[in-house]
Amino acid sequence: ASHPRMAAACGRRIVDMVWEDLTPEKILGKVNFLNAINAAMAMGCSTNAIIHLIAMSRRAGKDCMVSLDDFDLASRKVPVIANIRPSGDQYLMEDFYYAGGMPALLKQMKGHLNPNAMTVTGKTIGENIKDAQVHNEDVIRPLANAIYQEGALAVLKGNIAPGGAVIKPSACAEKFLKHTGPALVFDSYPDMKKAVEDEHLDVTEDHILVLRNAGPKGGPGMPEWGMLPIPVKLVKQGVRDMLRISDARMSGTSYGACILHVSPESYIGGPLALVNTGDLITVDVPNRTIQLEISDEELDQRKAKWVAPAAKYERGYGWMFSRHILQAEDGCDFDFLETNFGKPVPEPDIF
């Protein structure tokens, strides 16, 4: 119900910023993006925040750029203090709002922020939050009483994901943070959906479901398919979570042991394309690794035999999209929209 009010307030503020000449380059610095990353971790944010913030930073300029490494560093030092689902187990965003909202959360975690960063209000972040109050410390926890001692997200790397992959450990069963299991591989979303509904599917809770061809180019558009459904056979046995790996995304309200954003994606020949059903995969979230348990020689042999899929588009917007879209680790933006792609674009001539 407050969205129209907030939209109107944003519109008024944008007009005021024009009159104040408070332009994006006066606000967006790397420190702002690092503040945003730390706040996202404390919030128990969506995995999509990684893609958005990386893309925004790369548009803001080379001096502002953040990477998966910045998220990994933040995830090791900033605890989750917003006790809301899916990281929390009881409260919703409405409860968060009435507990003090974002200003209160930022005040609670101010030790992890640079207070001198300029904001769209024309004031620093420190000035913005100085009078904020927490009205319910079970919803917005003190740092000493965090619901999860490390950040909401973890960045994994290994021979399956040399460019990185992402998991939300605060929203998955603890037993899957260190796990080795056999892969069950699907090359398309329809194939996966059909298989998981088969009550005779050869699958156990220890299996790792793998969905590929769901990345930026393979999807196309990196759809939110990453929260793969638990096979019906296992659901009837009471299983509610299992490891799942894909080059897709998932919604911020989704949960489970889902490893997402595998980069480079399988559609362009990333190592995820080389995984076979039955291969053992080891995931070690505390040590930030994800590994296909085969030799480098075997991996090279599979790569040599890999055949690229036929192009999805040969003309039009789909062709342009496939040609210019970046991988997840680089923000899934068009390469030509980054500031380092070419010279600045001048204002158009008006005749």
Where in the sequence are the language-model features?
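Catalytic or ion-coupling anion/metal-binding cores of large enzyme and transporter domains
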Residues: 1-266, 270-351
